[in-house]
Each structure stands twice: as structure tokens, then as C-alpha cells.
Amino acid sequence: MLLSAIIIFTSLPLSVFANEGLPYGNDSIISKEIKKVYSDIVLIGGETVKFSAGNVYSFHAFSGEEGYYAVKITYRCSRENSGRPTLSVSVNGETPFSEAQSIQLMQRFENAAELTDEVVRSGRVPEQNEVYEKQTAYLSDTAHFYGSVLFFPFKQGDNEIEFKMEAESIEVSELLLCGGDQTPDYDTLNSSYKYKEYGGEPIYIEAETAKYKSDASLYAVNDSTSAATSPTSAYKKYLNTIGGSSWKNAGQYLEWEIEVPEDALYSVSFRYRQSVNAGMTSYRKMTIDGSEICTELNEMGFKYASRFENYTPYSGNKPILLELSKGKHIIRLEVVIGKLSSVLPEIEEIVSKLNSCYRKIIMITGSNPDSLRDYQLETAVPEVLETLEALRKQLKNIGGYIENVMEGGSAGTKTIGTLTAQLERFSKDAYTITGELSRFKTNITSLSTWMISAKSQPLLLDYMCLSGPNGKIKNAGASLGQSVAFQLSSFIYTFSKDYQVNTKAQGGNTVTVWTSSGQTQLSILRQMIEDDFYNDHNFTVDLKLVTTSLLMAIAAGKGPDMALNVATTDAMNYAYRNAVVDLAEFSDFSEIKTRFRASALTSVSYKDSVYALPFTQSFHMLFYRSDIISELGIKIPETWQDVINALATLKKNNLEFGIPIPSDLNTFYSMLYQNGGRLYNEKSTAAELASYESISAFTQWSEFFTDYQSPKQFDAQNRFRTGEMPIVISDISLYCTLNVLAPEIQGLWGMSLIPGTVKADGTVDHTGSATETCSVMLKNSNKNECWDFLK
């Protein structure tokens, strides 16, 4: 066992580790019998060291024997951070497993104002502020597939461990190598209890009053589906619950500060609803005052419930009791993957391998093969058939496990069963593959979609209750009389309810603002107006959600003072008809326009006049599958000629290059500008599409569809995921879509600027075109107030 440790701290320059590492669960990395070393090695203690973004921090530690260590860290997030701190870890110069490349540390937030009864009844969500307090945690994989702790391999003797801050900065006050916490089961814990059982009245803690949370998105929300929700109203939207779809990702937590009246043993219950993932169970881990309690509370399962139900954790046929001393305590509920954590990484790997097999098949057959032709796949790609058979056996075992732990299965077992049966047909007769290729692709996508939903652990909480084991707690459902009265009152109220998301009256003039944004965005905008804008302005903003035509309202003389989220083409149409205000006439416009890129104002300008301010902007990027283009020997295209060069290799392997469909002219505009052309003349009085540059750009653009047969219609997300289209130009929103909906290709794709055109001086022009919406001010008598709001 370890007798001593040698600790050396150094700060190294930014570097990239060459060894990416295998997955954590790989048998060659972590054996099923992990030998953990339990003597602590202190790397940082008694001092505070700032880990700055971009730096690498190296420590040397002497281990008396070979074994595995967990890393325990006490840290404080830096105030200059804009997101979660992320670090990577290497041991003895190597990344031991791929999960060590990106390890996130949680932030901490609280309500800016206390959630009093008045705030609850107002329906106005308090602003969320980050709390810069010390937190203690074990380094764990970002997806939390492997529980709360990652164990790193150390050899006997001297070891070097390096921490590289990939993003943001933290202040570290303690850093330990240790064996992790040893959590007892409930029977062991119960035998050590000394307090008596609580015999008083049940203690209710409103869930929406959570003191701390891991994300700013975890705030109190309204639920008006039940008369038994506490508190509730048939007429107003009380902030009476917390969680739901915003509390679903592994690692997210909520903390409540509770106070108990005496030293005693308490049973804990929750009123909850989980109506998002049908047939699935959402899991939570409970800790008290920062410590795990027992193994049973590390995976509390909240089953699917379309209506509110009560949940009390049990051990056998008895409720689990918590030994709490008199006074205040912190109860934390953290999202965990639960019983599926052991198979989801395996499914993710299977999806990746199935996509690879599918891609290798279409390299032979094409994506639309002739079902009557025998492509001799047994000879062409025998290794693919062997892989498919191995994956079939894996899926069959996983399906049985899921059916067992989910007590009868779920949508996942049906999806796995369908895919397993198909793979069995492929194994018996490879000739059937071409006829079922489209369904094979669909089944892979279905498995990936289910995997994403299985990772999601949504849970809505109304309240928590502490009572004695025999205490009588409130029913989760309302009585028939309560339900009828509540629903009847709600129905009657609909005849007089104002469905607009208006701000409170402020006094002074009233400015009417229309927007076509969603209800959530509208509520956020309303809150920003009331919390910030009203502090410095003495007039009322009447905010309305309107999806009808603004043009008809203007023509009828019923239009608003301002409109948000308007298409730039519509804004200029109103400008030509003298219906909107030229913003350039305001004295401080020259200062305001510096907030935006000059190009963002081009589409709403004419000569020296500017008729709107940008509201949203979207543009194209180049997305590429790094694994596939590396395999094919294709470099990331920097120019359009690079794309053409890559097309020969892609076509030879029956793969595609995706360029936005002809109805999306942004790619053509990009080529036009890169070739030195423009849409209009200098005075913007005539189009210049007949110029040499314009015709050259149009020819270049159209040849991708005529000469190179790029598909005119395609699903960029799915074809990129499967690898059919390893290079695609798409809207920037695809970045977020892939991060959320394509976990199986995480780390296997990248994003770059759209291809450019080489200039005479050798530089590459990557000029692109953007799609925008804007905010306009209609001609009215409240110009100054409207300008104050708009800017």
C-alpha cells in the first residue's frame, strides 16, 4: 500500500495529446475486477491554484503499488467563465480512455430573489445567478455512463498526471487521488442507526423552492393539470413545480435546504410526474450534506406516470429511513442514467458499427441498389457480414437485459427486436440485404433515437415530504369533487382570460410590440422587460404574440408600434411603401449600429437609410465526417476546387456531397461574392445578375447539380449521421442538432468555413451569405419610446 507521495506542480503550455484512448468500458482498459488503491495522495492541499483555460498542470505522485485511483477535486468556478469548466486528463503521457478527453465540472446557480408566496403567485421566474462557492466532486465521464467516478490507472512507482483546462477556468483548493467513497447498502446502514423514528406531523418542502441548481435553466415552472398541486390556481399560473424536460441530463442536480425539528429517523416521499418518456423510468441519486447515503438511494427509480404520483424509496417492503440530526441539512437529487447505464455505451458503440457497416455496403451497392441484382456481398465485404452477425448476438443479449430491468420492456426492446430479426435474415441470406437496405437504415436511426430518449431522464417535482415510517402523507391525486371544481373553474376562466404575454403596466405612454416568436421566447422577453428595461424607462410595453400577417394589419391601420422577428424582405417592402421609420435619422444610430457587423445591416439598408435592426442571423458552414474522409484520404475542403477533387473519390465509393437545394440561394450568393460579383449596382437601382462574375458564379453553382449530380433533396442530419454524405454544407443549426441527436458520432465530425475561392494574391475568400430576421419600427407618435426599446 502507498507509503509516500512526491508532488511537483508545473504549468505547461497548450498541447494536444496524441493518444486519444479507448472507451472507458473497454476490457483492455478497465478489467471487471478493478483493483482500487485506497490511500489518498494529496496533489493540492492548503493552497489555492488557479487552473486557467488553455494551460496544462502536471503533478508527480509516487504509488507504492499498481492500481486505480479516482480524482477528487474541490474547486470554485471563475467569475469570468461563460460556461461549464472542461478539462482533460492524461496519466504518464497517455490519455487512458476516450472519456478522459472531456470531463465537465458543474456550475452552481441560485434564484436572484427569494421564492416568496408573492413571487410564486406572480408567475414571474426570478433571474438565476451563478454562485461562486466551493464545490467538491469526483471526476466523472460527461455522459455519466460509468456512475459518479472515473478510475485512472497508475503504475507502481513514480507517475505523472496532467490536467489540461480545455475550457473556462477554476480555482482549485484541494486535489486528491483516492479510492472513491464506499457506500453501504441500506441493511448495513440501518443497523448503525441510533435515533428513534420520527412521530410528528409530516414536513412538506415545496420543490420549486430549491436553493441551488446545476443549471440556470432549472427554475420554478407552472403546472395547472391537477387540483392537488401545491399551490395551485384555476385562474393564475403559479410557480408551483420544478424540473420537467429541463431536468433530464445526467449530472444535473437540484438542492434543497431543509430543517428538521428533532434528531430522528425520517422517511422521504416525493410527489412527481414523469409523462415525457412513455414506458421509461427516470432515475435520481440522493445525497445529504454532500455524502451518499446507501446504494439503494443512488438509483431511485421514478416510473412513467401520466398523472402525479407519490414515490417513496423502499428497501424490500420497508421504507428507507434517513437519520437526520436536528437543524438544517442539504438534500440533493442528481440525475443518473440508472439501470441502463451498463448497456447504453454498448448500444452507442453498436450504432456506430452498424452505420459503418451500412456505409461499406452502399460503397458497393449505392444508396438505391437494384433489389434484383446480386452484388455478391459475401465476397465483396465478408468482414461486414461477420460484424453484423456479432452485433446481432450483442443486440439479442441487450434486448433480454432491458426487458428484464424494465419489467416487460419498452419501445427499446421492440426496436432492438426488429433490428435483431433483420440482422438474422441478413446472416442467413446476404442477398436480402439490398432489398432491405432502406429499412436497415431506418432501423439504425430508430435505435439511435431510442438511445437518446433512454439517456433522457425528465422528472417534474411538486413537493418533498419528510415523515415517520407510518406517517400519513397527502394523496398525490385530487378527489373527484376537487378535480371537477378545478376543471370547471379553469374552463369558465377561458372566456375572460387574456392570452397575450403582456408586461405589467408601467405608466406613461404605451408602446405596442408584436412578435411571432414562440411562447417561451416571449415569456423570457417579457421578464427581461420587467426586470431590466423598466428600471430605466417610464413607459409601458404591450407585448403581444401575433402570427397573423403584419401587412394586413398595417393596411387596415391596426398595426403595432414595433414588430420583431420580421423577414428582411418584408421590412424592405414596408420601407418602399413608407410604412416604417428610417432608423438612421436618430442621433445615436451611428453608435448603435456598431453593435452589429456591417453586413448584418446590408439587407435592410437603401443608400444612407437603414430601416431595421437585426433580430436573428443564420449562415452556412461546412460539416465533415473526419473518420470517413480520413479513411478515404480526402482533406478537409478549403476551396470549391477541393470539393470537386473530393467528389471523384466520394462518387467512386457511392457517397455524396451535400450542397443546399436550389431553392436555397445562399450558396450561389456566396460564390457570387467570392468571384467579385454583386447583386445590385452601386446605387442599388438595378440588378447585376447579367455580369460576367454573376454568370460565372451561377454556372459554377449549377454544375454541382448537373455535372456532379449532387442530390437536390436530402435530409442532411440523417445522411450525415449514417455517413452517406460525409461532407455537407448546411445551416449552422446543424451543429446543435448533431450534438444532441447524434451521440454515436461524437468526436467523429467537425465543422469548418464554407469552401472559398482562391484570390490573385493566393488567399482564400470564404465570404458567405446569411439569412436574417429583423425588428422594425412602424410610423407612429411614440418614436422615441420605440427607439429606446428597439436599441
Language-model features: locations:
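Hinge/lid segment of periplasmic solute-binding proteins
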Residues: 487-507, 568-621, 642-644, 746-755, ...
